[in-house]
UniProtKB/Swiss-Prot annotation:
CDD domains: DMB-PRT_CobT. Belongs to the CobT family. This is Nicotinate-nucleotide--dimethylbenzimidazole phosphoribosyltransferase. The keyword Calcium does not apply. The lineage of its organism: Bacteria, Pseudomonadati, Pseudomonadota, Gammaproteobacteria, Alteromonadales. The gene is cobT.
């Protein structure tokens, strides 16, 4: 379904030379230099010649952050501090402009889109994209969360949305999520893919008690035992323990990479979706930039297993794409120095190593 081209290494020598000849010691801008390298490679995929590349200016265009919302049947078993009704209430808050992600997007220059992937109370707002796969997933410790047909429909929905955003000029896409109970799904995905004990994968989400943590661990262990025959295949894994929003995020990552877009990965839930996407097509990882390490237990280990270094560590545990949103100034700074910082020759400065 997704044909993703590996990043072109043809111009690596030109990128490295340009970075290394800026008026600074080698490597002095640290991780920003690596981000500049990755972004330039992603955004220059259509360039064919050295001459064309030399004239090319890599820029972030119409950065868009999409919040995918979905309800989880497992929430009824008390694995979260909030009831499922809060998902729809927060979608209404996104539409009204009152959530943290609204403020961050307004301040930092993101276009914000909200997608109903399947919540108990359908949003009446015309601003919300209707990609519903149902009202709510089935409890993952009792049944398959959804069918494989629903997973494939979610991928199709995500692909259509990404194509629409691409046509609007977007070349940098971030994802956020809203779904009461979705850290339980993400923990199950993490445990299945990394073959880790559930206790290392389950965290407090938005702040549950010790009693709820124990219940959450038990639920995930039950789910993994019930669905052990489905854990190796990524599509079957999503059907077994995923969420409607996690399915769409996974599909959107794959679709965005297929379109040559930079993909900014948010926190624990989005990183779980990224692991599934990588399992489906490992090349997608070349397009992923991990924005932050959240305060959710397991996220740091997840990032370590993926061998990626996040840009920020702010102890966030909100979701919504807030960490991804906050990374945009760093991405812009990386391209800013790459495009505009003087070289030693331009500035008449003696080159230092």
């Amino acid at each position: 379904m997704f044909k993703i081209a590996p990043l072109n290494n043809q111009f690596d020598h030109l990128i490295h030379n340009k970075i290394n000849n800026k008026t600074k010691p080698l490597g002095a801008l640290g991780q920003l230099e690596l981000i500049a390298l990755q972004l330039v490679k992603i955004l220059s995929q259509t360039i064919k010649s050295d001459v064309e590349f030399t004239a090319f200016k890599a820029e972030i265009c119409n950065p868009t952050l999409v919040v995918f919302a979905g309800d989880h049947g497992i929430a009824a078993q008390g694995v979260s501090i909030a009831p499922s009704e809060v998902t729809a209430q927060m979608v209404a808050n996104f539409v009204a402009g009152g959530a943290a992600i609204n403020i961050f997007c307004q301040q930092l220059g993101w276009q914000l889109e909200v997608v109903d992937c399947g919540i108990l109370e359908k949003s009446p707002a015309s601003k919300v994209h209707d990609c519903r796969l149902g009202n709510i997933t089935a409890p993952l410790n009792l049944h398959m969360a959804m069918s494989t047909a629903q997973v494939k429909q979610g991928f199709s929905n995500a692909k259509s949305l990404v194509l629409q955003l691409k046509q609007q000029g977007c070349n940098t896409l971030a994802m956020g999520e809203m779904g009461i109970g979705n850290t339980t799904s993400a923990a199950a995905i993490m445990a299945a893919i990394l073959n880790l004990p559930v206790t290392q994968c389950v965290g407090r989400g938005t702040g549950v008690s010790d009693e709820l943590i124990a219940r959450k661990i038990n639920v995930v262990e039950q789910a993994l035992q019930l669905h052990k025959a489905h854990l190796a295949d990524p599509i079957a894994l999503l059907a077994a323990v995923g969420g409607f929003e996690i399915v769409h995020i996974t599909g959107a990552m794959l679709a965005a990479a297929e379109q040559g877009m930079a993909v900014i990965v948010d926190g624990f839930i989005c990183s779980a979706a990224a692991m599934v996407a990588i399992k489906i097509n490992p090349i997608v990882k070349e397009y992923l930039i991990f924005a932050h390490c959240s305060n959710e237990q397991g996220h740091q280990q997840m990032l370590s297993k993926l061998e990626v270094k996040p840009l920020l560590q702010l102890d966030l545990r909100l979701g919504e794409g807030t960490g991804a949103a906050l990374s945009l100034p760093l991405l812009q700074a990386a391209l800013g120095f790459y495009n505009h910082m003087a070289s030693f020759a331009d500035a008449g400065v003696e080159q230092v190593v």
